[in-house]
């Protein structure tokens, strides 16, 4: 769900660093553009955005965006990144805001070696555009990521049902609640007399009448 998509990022490479670089990628037509998004400072637990930020107004409705830790040397994300569809983000009344939760094994934030993961999501519950960085250790309560805020009176769009083709020979799944007696049976093939019987009756009648008239005329001629 939008606002709850999580990106789990391994932080083993920052064991001796004081910052976590965050990148964002915009995908469109199988082409992806990756640019620096900002840096998480440790132990200050703050986010410093880079000069190049996402311009949501210039993105197409078919684009996708994802953020996380990207390794330039291997051209890969260090962990699976959830994608957000721009079409859903641009219809929301508020500007998306970065929300980072840093997971660690200890309550001491200055022990960088204790940090294990970063959870990233887009937060739409606040008017503020500044990113939120939180720390979560074993004794901390589980954070609740807010969902996307919709305009008053709006309804979530329902997925459209796929149109069923009318091509002959296409197979359809039988509904479990439909009785077999209610299913239409295929029509039986008619015999020759069933198809043309109504036409043969008057023809036979005319043949018989013609034969009787011929016999009667022959009898009159013989007299």
UniProtKB/Swiss-Prot annotation:
Transmembrane feature ranges: 191-211
Q: Which UniProt keywords apply?
A: Endoplasmic reticulum, Glycoprotein, Membrane, Signal, Transmembrane, Transmembrane helix
Listed under GO biological process in this entry are: protein insertion into ER membrane
- Residue ranges under compositional bias (Acidic residues)? 176-187
Q: Name one GO cellular component term.
A: EMC complex
Q: Where in the cell is it found?
A: Endoplasmic reticulum membrane
Q: Where is this region: Disordered?
A: 149-188
Coiled-coil regions, chain positions: none
Which stretches are tagged as biased composition: Basic and acidic residues? Answer: 159-174
Signal peptide stretch: 1-17
Tell me the membrane topology, using the record's own terms.
Single-pass membrane protein
Give the record's glycosylation annotations as residue positions: 58
Q: What is the protein's given name?
A: Uncharacterized protein C19D5.02c
Species in which this protein is naturally found: Schizosaccharomyces pombe (strain 972 / ATCC 24843) (Fission yeast)
What does the record give as the organism's lineage? Eukaryota, Fungi, Dikarya, Ascomycota, Taphrinomycotina
